[in-house]
Amino acid sequence: MTRLGFVLDSGSCIGCHACTVVCKSEHEVPLGVNRTWLKYVETGSHPQTDRHFSVMRCNHCEDAPCMSICPTNALFRADNGVVDFDDDNCIGCKSCMNACPYDALYIHPETMTAHKCNFCNHRVTEGLEPACVVVCPTQAIRVGDLDDPNSELAQLHASGEGLVRSPEQNTKPRVIY
């Protein structure tokens, strides 16, 4: 079995927004919404301040609350472990948006259906990497398979050194920082 996930290295991210731009282009994401976005984290106090960047997106959770609450099964787990969506089955009820602790879903303003990062599953199933991984100039975004003990993702997960967002939610995210 394959369980794909992301390693997001906030220390390497330079805040260039290449990932957000390529995602918008790859998926024709309209203005005003994003599948991937950057969070600016500023620390310290004047005059000694620092700014870090963190890539935010769907966490493709093992126990995805968006999937379990969806009344039409529009959100589903693909064979590679990715939480994907079927636009044709979505009724736009927003239950998934309310259930997601990571604020990763949005309603597409034209189709009025839920959308989110789908790991560029159309690319991955063809043996390609997600567009954000390809375009990142510092390799701050990497992919791996949690079921492959040799992958960086699996090793980071096993070591306990990687961090996940909101671990108290018990969703078992597949995005490790």
Model-based region annotation:
Residues M1-Y177:
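Non-ligating segments of multi-cofactor redox enzymes
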